[in-house]
Regions:
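Long amphipathic alpha-helical segments
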Residues: 2-46
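Active-site/ligand-binding-proximal alpha/beta "capping" segment
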Residues: 189, 193-245
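Conserved small/polar residues in nucleotide/adenosyl-binding loops
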Residues: 277-283
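Glycine-rich beta-alpha junction loops
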Residues: 175, 203-206, 245-249, 272-276
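Positively charged, low-complexity intrinsically disordered leader regions
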Residues: 17-18, 22, 42-109, 113
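Active-site-proximal loop->helix
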Residues: 126-183, 279
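A short, small-residue-rich loop immediately preceding and capping a beta-strand
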Residues: 94, 102, 110-134, 138-147, ...
Length: 287
């Protein structure tokens, strides 16, 4: 994928939602076309609406707790004798993970759309936990679809979702894991889209969900850019930004403000589990 200069990362796709080559798009059944179009139209209005941006920023600061810290790891830097190592402490955010940015924005969108319910899927449970937190904050009823096997593996997060008032729906079809939870969640949304908003927990699925998630987590990158300039008085001549990669939501947010920089100055490095999908291999350097 060749990036276009001066264009935000969430707008790097073509008119059909493709992000270069075979990645992206909107592979959806006909029944989802209208809900997806409506959500796309609403989001494109809200992302430029000054009142909505002010509301988002208010909750990012006073509910999520932004900005999160940018901390030098002095002992590790000394141990390695050379590199100056820093950490962006996104774990300081309310709930302990970056998923809260996306969940909060989705609930704000749901309120603007006049929806009373939010529905989402989860695997490890963090996206579901954050959505249940945000739904409770904004007075929305919440339903989370989760594979039956994942429910057994992730009891603490399941308990947290229930404490926040969410209904956790076990999915027994297929592998009883995330992929099946996503399918069941989509089916439910198709039948209830008149009063229900769907939140996809990462940069996956139809293009609009990738955009909303990336737009939400980009807060991390905006903060980081300011903090780096404050620490070094400018963007250093040589810097490596290392982030974990799973669904892509944190990496998307962590890197989005730095895509216009020359790779010789800022190297973006993703660290992914060994059981990676082969689709990622041509696009991003991994260690």
């Amino acid at each position: 994928m060749k990036l276009k200069k001066k264009i935000p990362l969430i707008d790097q796709h073509n008119k059909n939602g493709f992000w270069g080559g075979k990645f992206g798009g909107n592979f959806i059944p006909e029944t989802l076309k209208k809900p997806i179009e409506d959500l796309t139209e609403l989001f494109e209005k809200l992302r430029y609406d000054k009142k909505f941006l002010k509301e988002r920023d208010y909750y990012f600061k006073n509910y999520i707790g932004t900005p999160t810290s940018f901390v030098k790891l002095q002992n590790l830097s000394d141990h390695l004798s050379g590199a100056q190592i820093y950490a962006k402490m996104v774990s300081e955010a309310n709930g302990g993970a970056h998923k809260i940015y996306n969940a909060t924005v989705h609930c704000l969108i749901a309120k603007k759309a006049g929806k009373k319910y939010v529905v989402g899927d989860t695997g490890a449970g963090y996206a579901g936990k954050m959505l249940s937190m945000a739904a409770k904050k904004f007075g929305l009823k919440c339903k989370i679809f989760m594979g039956a096997k994942d429910i057994k593996r992730q009891k603490p997060n399941v308990d947290a979702m229930k404490k926040n008032g969410a209904e956790v729906v076990p999915v027994y079809s297929g592998s009883q894991t995330l992929v099946d939870a996503v399918s069941e969640c989509m089916r439910y949304w198709v039948s209830n889209c008149d009063n229900t908003h769907m939140c996809v927990g990462s940069t996956v699925g139809p293009n609009i969900f990738v955009k909303i998630c990336g737009w939400s987590t980009a807060q991390i990158s905006r903060e980081l850019k300011v903090q780096i300039k404050s620490e070094f008085k400018k963007i250093p001549k040589k810097i490596k930004l290392i982030n974990c990669v799973g669904g892509g939501s944190s990496a998307y947010g962590f890197w989005s403000e730095f895509i216009d920089y020359d790779k010789k100055q800022i190297e973006l490095i993703g660290v992914e589990a060994v059981s990676y999908t082969h689709l990622t291999l041509p696009t991003t350097p991994y260690v």
